[in-house]
Structure formats: C-alpha cells, structure tokens
C-alpha cells in the first residue's frame, strides 16, 4: 500500500491548499477514479459536449481528464490552485498541451471563450461557503461563449445512511492483505451543510497517516439556483456519465447548465 513519505510532508506548501505534495504523490495511483474504465467514458462525453470549441477545466489537478482530452487534439485549458498537482500533468500523454493557470477557480480568469467549462470529481464541494460556490458558477459563466455549457460532477450526500443520532458514514473499508489498510469516512453537519472527508491509512509496520479535507455539500436544487444567479439554465441532469436518469437511489449527479445566446 502506497503512502506519502516524510519527505513528501516536508515539501508540502501551504499555498497548495488541501492538495499539497503529500497528496499529489499518490493522486495518480492506479485504479479507482484513475481506472481507464472510469476516465474514458467521461472523456467521451466531454469531447462530444465541447464539439469544435475549446474546453476549460476548473480544478484541473494532475490532468486526469484534461490530458486525455488534449491527447485527442482538443484545445484544453485548466485552472488549478496546487502547483504540486499541476507538476504531474506533463507526465501524461497530452499533458504538455494543456494550458494551465495557477489560481483560484472562484475568481481566476484565463483568455478566450469556451464551449465547455467543467468541474468533476466532487470539486465544487471543496469550496466550503455558499458565496464561494456561487462565485464558481459566475466565473464559469464568464468564460463561456453564448450557447456554451458548464458541467459539474458531484456526489450526493449520504445523509440517508446516517445512523439515528450519528454524524458519521464510512465510505471505504479496505484491509491490505500485506497488513494494515485504509478506512475512509465522512462526518456531516446537517445544519451548516459542512462535512469532512477523513482518510486513515495504516501500513504493515503499524505506522499510519490521517488526512481530513473539508467540504460543503449542496443539493441539485441549490446548484440550479446558483446557476440562475450566474445567468445559466439547466440543460441536462444525469445519474452518471452513461446519461442514466437521476433517481432516489443515485449517489451522484452530472449536471449541465447552458449560457443563453441572448439575455
């Protein structure tokens, strides 16, 4: 089981926020969100939505999605706060063709107009205030050409899984056959819509690492209101990248809002 080393922790830069070197070191580990079976359907949909226009990924990270899009010959730009994450984009095919700007996705602007702005893998929730999330929508809309679209992929909070009177839901329990393992759990504050995602990794020798990342969840209806504030209107909402319908059993949604051709 891999994990950040003490040297990685020593290199962490506070300017990288919640995704410094110690996180970036493991971010591209095989499997999970990096599995080609997960990535390729996403890239297919995004490429189709972009058509002949340019794409902008907010919170581009290590280029998990942006690099494969660029490898297909698409014009891809990205905004990312963490230099440690961005340093890994060029390790991927197509990564050297992604134009990255270091900055905050709530306010950083890049040149040009885009047919698609997108924000995937729950990253809207990394913005932990309602005003900040609204600012993301406003910034996305400012980058869109008329008729352009803003796409978000985000999980639905597992509030129905909370035991009565409790605030914690485990999402992964993964023992390692070699010893140790990994446990992940979310802790919710249903009053403020804040939650923390907690990650505990234990190695075979008994040493471990704990990481906590704060989030703010927003229901689809709240995101639609944010979109309206930004001048966007809902175009599609799916349960997953296969475009299946959103149901009461869905654990996430992929939502797309469109910028009108005129006011």
Can you say where each PLM-predicted feature lies in the sequence?
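Class I SAM-dependent methyltransferase SAM/SAH-binding core
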Residues: 62-107
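A short acidic, Gly/Pro-enriched loop at the edge of an enzyme's catalytic core
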Residues: 109-116
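A conserved beta-strand element that flanks and buttresses the S-adenosyl-L-methionine
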Residues: 118-120
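A short glycine-rich, Lys/Arg-flanked "PGG" loop and its adjoining helix->strand segment in the class I
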Residues: 134-146
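SAM-dependent methyltransferase
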Residues: 151-228
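C-terminal lobe and adjacent flexible extensions of AdoMet/dcAdoMet transferase-like proteins
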Residues: 218-263
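Conserved class I S-adenosyl-L-methionine
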Residues: 1-61
């Amino acid at each position: 089981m891999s994990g950040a080393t003490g040297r990685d922790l020593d290199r962490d830069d506070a300017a990288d926020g919640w995704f410094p070197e110690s996180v970036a070191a493991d971010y591209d580990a095989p499997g999970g969100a990096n599995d080609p079976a997960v990535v390729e359907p996403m890239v297919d949909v995004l490429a189709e939505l972009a058509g002949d226009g340019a794409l902008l990924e907010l919170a581009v990270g290590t280029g998990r999605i942006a690099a494969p899009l660029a490898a297909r010959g698409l014009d891809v730009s990205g905004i990312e706060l963490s230099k440690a994450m961005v340093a890994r984009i060029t390790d991927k095919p197509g990564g050297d063709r992604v134009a990255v700007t270091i900055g905050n996705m709530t306010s950083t602007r890049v040149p040009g107009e885009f047919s698609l702005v997108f924000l995937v893998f729950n990253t809207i929730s990394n913005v932990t205030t309602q005003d900040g999330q609204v600012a993301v929508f406003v910034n996305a809309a400012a980058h869109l050409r008329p008729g352009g679209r803003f796409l978000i992929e985000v999980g639905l909070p597992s509030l129905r899984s909370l035991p009565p009177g409790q605030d914690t839901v485990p999402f992964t329990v993964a023992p390692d056959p070699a010893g140790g393992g990994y446990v992940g759990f979310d802790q919710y504050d249903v009053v403020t819509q804040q939650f923390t995602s907690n990650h505990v990794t234990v190695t075979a020798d008994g040493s471990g690492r704990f990481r906590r990342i704060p989030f703010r969840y927003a229901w689809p209806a709240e995101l639609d209101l944010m979109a309206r504030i930004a001048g966007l209107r809902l175009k599609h909402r799916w349960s997953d990248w296969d475009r299946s319908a959103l149901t009461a059993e869905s654990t996430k949604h992929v939502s797309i809002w469109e910028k009108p051709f005129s006011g």
